[in-house]
Every structure is written in C-alpha cells, then in structure tokens.
Regions:
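Ser/Thr/Gly-rich flexible loops in soluble cytosolic domains mediating phosphotransfer, phosphorylation
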Residues: 81-125, 226-232, 239
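Metallocofactor- and cofactor-centric catalytic cores in central/energy metabolism, strongly enriched
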Residues: 38-57, 63-67
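Short beta->alpha junction loops
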Residues: 36-46, 176-178, 253
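Internal active-site segments that recognize and position negatively charged phosphoryl groups
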Residues: 124-170
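Short beta-strand-centered segment that lines the nucleotide-binding/catalytic pocket of NTP-utilizing
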Residues: 171-182
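Conserved phosphate-donor/acceptor-positioning beta-strand/loop module used by diverse small-molecule
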Residues: 191-210
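N-terminal accessory targeting/assembly segments
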Residues: 1-21, 25
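Small-molecule kinase domains that catalyze NTP-dependent phosphoryl transfer to phosphate-bearing small molecules
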Residues: 130-137, 211, 218-259
Length: 273
C-alpha cells in the first residue's frame, strides 16, 4: 500500500501558477496518493509559522512554494528545515538565474504578473470575442478572428477556443454539420486566414456524442451517434481540409492544452511567413 502525502501549496499570490506546476508534476507519478492544501497570499512570517506548525504535526508533509520576496522565501526554507519538513521553492533558482542572465535585479514583487497591462486587456477582448463567436455564430466577423477552428460535432472546438482566448487569441469556431455551411469568404481566401481543422476517431466521437445525447433529449440519438455516419462526416471534413490546404489536428488523444499549443505554433509560423 502506498503512503499518503500531505502536499502544501504555499504562494504569495493567487496560487494559480503553483497549482498548474503541481498538476504537471503529479502527472509524472502513477502511484502518488496525496491530499492537497492550498494557501494563497502568504506574505508574513506569522502565516508561514502557522503552516509549518500544521505540517509538522502530520506525517509525510511536503511544502511547495512560490514566494518571490527573498527574505520570506529564506524564512519558509529555514523553518521547514528546522522542523524537518521537505520544502521546495519553485521560482527561486529560476529568478536568480534570469537575474544573472539579464544582468538586472529582479523586483521580487508578488502578483507582478497580474498587473493590468496591455496583455491583460488583450485577453479580455479575446475572451469576449470568442464567447460571442462560438459554434458558428457571427461568421460575418471572420476578418477579426486570429484563429478559425473547423470540425464536426464534439471535436473540442469550444473548449479549445476558450483556452486560446485566455491566451489572447480571438478564436471563432464553426461546426461542420449539414445545415451549417462554412462562409464563402473562407473558400475564396483559404490561404489568408489561420484556419485549422480538428478531427477525431469516429468511435471515440460516438461515445462522446452518446453522453451528450443522454443530456439533450432533443438530439436524434441514432443519426448523431452512428459510427458509420460519423466516419463519413470525419472523412468529408478531412477531404475539405486537404482541398484548401488547412492544417489538421487529431484531438483524439490530446488534451485541450496540447491541441492549443499546436494551434499556437501553427499561428506563429503563418504570422511570420
């Protein structure tokens, strides 16, 4: 039986960065039984003392932290060592290395990444655009989109679009269904836009569609989930993507993050041509 670990995520900001890092870290270990506790906006020694006190009472405690203020980072490290609690700073060495490389002193300011700068407003604008141009809506605004996603039903168009929007890309997605034709402007200017086709394994699509149909009773279950019919849908979409020279991504075994990363790479290559 595997031991259970108590993982403490301690951050001087929202903790979002640390949580993402931990998710990536834990995915590398198949047999990792843990209970996670998160502490955000930790900016005093008193807060750290309270966390260390709790950690030291439990077996198998581990602290991961992102604290950019040098004095406080040293304090949590010292107190953890004193109480024999394994403690790992995520940003410390990285900030130091960058400081040396750039030949400038780091500001060591918590939440510096959350300053309302141009990038922030760009993301907000992208999110608003993407939400109002989901599932084939307002295709007349296609010239305003950074990225256009095409695909048959349940190929992760919407979640991928939202993820891209959070990265600052105005994304418009269009479902490839019989009663929804793609805009003529795409066909006439197929190389002008950054269009990406999403495809998936028909059997996997059938499973996902069955789940959706069980929630939405108005859907024709047989027509919507028939594997042979889906094979035709996917094959037709592939032919269209090939006809217009649009890059295709198979999302069957990809997470939304992986799909989005590939899309961003395609976008950057096209932009820099």
């Amino acid at each position: 039986m595997n031991e259970k670990y108590n993982v403490y995520l301690v951050s001087d900001s929202t903790g979002e960065t640390l949580d993402r890092i931990f998710l990536s870290l834990k995915s590398q270990f198949a047999n990792f039984d843990y209970e996670k506790k998160e502490y955000a906006f930790v900016r005093t020694e008193q807060q750290i003392d309270k966390i260390i006190k709790e950690c030291s009472k439990l077996q198998n405690s581990i602290i991961l932290y992102t604290i950019v203020e040098t004095k406080l980072a040293k304090y949590i490290s010292k107190q953890s060592e004193k109480n024999k609690v394994p403690c790992f700073g995520i940003l410390g060495n990285l900030i130091l290395s960058f400081s040396k490389l750039l030949n400038q002193k780091a500001i060591h300011k918590p939440s510096a990444q959350h300053v309302l700068d141009d990038d922030y407003y760009k993301r907000i604008e992208a999110i608003q655009f993407t939400m109002s141009h989901d599932d084939g809506k307002k295709t007349e605004d296609i010239n305003q989109a950074d990225i256009i996603l095409l695909g048959v039903s349940r190929t992760s168009k919407t979640p991928t679009s939202i993820y891209l929007a959070n990265r600052g890309y105005k994304t418009l997605n269009i479902p490839l269904v019989l009663d929804h034709k793609i805009p003529q402007i795409l066909k006439e200017n197929f190389s002008k836009f950054c269009v990406i086709g999403l495809v998936a394994d028909p059997e996997r699509l059938s499973e996902i569609r069955r789940t959706r149909a069980s929630v939405n009773q108005s859907i024709d279950l047989k027509a919507y989930t028939d594997v042979e019919a889906i094979k035709v849908e996917v094959e037709n979409s592939k032919k269209m993507f090939k006809q217009y020279g649009w890059p295709t991504i198979d999302v069957t075994r990809r997470s939304v993050e992986e799909t989005a990363a590939s899309i961003i790479k395609i976008f950057e290559i096209k932009k820099n041509k």
